[in-house]
Amino acid sequence: MSIRIIPQDELGSSEKRTADMIPPLLFPRLKNLYNRRAERLRELAENNPLGDYLRFAALIAHAQEVVLYDHPLEMDLTARIKEASAQGKPPLDIHVLPRDKHWQKLLMALIAELKPEMSGPALAVIENLEKASTQELEDMASALFASDFSSVSSDKAPFIWAALSLYWAQMANLIPGKARAEYGEQRQYCPVCGSMPVSSMVQIGTTQGLRYLRCNLCETEWHVVRVKCSNCEQSGKLHYWSLDDEQAAIKAESCDDCGTYLKILYQEKEPKVEAVADDLASLVLDARMEQEGYARSSINPFLFPGEGE
């Protein structure tokens, strides 16, 4: 199954009635999203060997919250949704959609917000980005979207991505339409922008027991059934790994068919789990999965591969 976004005026009456039974997509709910993430990162930093880096990530997340409301985005995406729907493509496809200068405006605002909080190497990095030309910044964004991580140093990538993510999340929040599940391929990528997931979550509340993958760029969540590999959609050779016990709130789902894994967070075990924060704070589990020979099928927006990795 794949997911396609349908313009509201093209939905039939039966689709309008059934679209919300199991929502294929959950568009980003931006209110306090970044504050919640920052709060969770700070909480997880306590007694964590990665505490300093988690607190660093919390500073970026908090800055995203501030910049989000200081620099709103106004954009009519109706025509874009119709065109993408007709082509069966993600409406905000990172490989096709032209980038507006708004994202660089967001980056400069993030840098201004973060400067007083940074020192040493981190301050040098954002000052270097501040001096970069428009074309240099565009080249780095294009490299990240092409997974050419050797062209963007791992210390610059989180700042570039934070601005791009804000821009794409703002656009995703403006999408006028519904989503429909259809037969198709590439369910491992976000149906809204085509980026990768950061992790998946088995939710509580109105989507109790359903698993959704969280986009590492536009913050959209999309439904993928449980006990199926989110990367290759096979189900016969899945294994579940945790550092604690079978009741752990964070597990890695590995697949021997494609050799990859993705983390699953369980809200029923820990209601405060957050897709980005808890993934970043559990890198010990990633190390275990690497030892077992599995490759990660996701990327955390605060931790990009460096050159040679």
Curated annotation (Swiss-Prot):
One annotated GO biological process: protein maturation
PANTHER family per record: PROTEIN FDHE
Record GO terms (molecular function): ferric iron binding
Record protein name field: Protein FdhE
Superkingdom of the source species: Bacteria
UniProt KW Cytoplasm keyword: yes
Organism, scientific name: Escherichia coli O127:H6 (strain E2348/69 / EPEC)
Gene field: fdhE
Alphabetically ordered keywords of this record: Cytoplasm
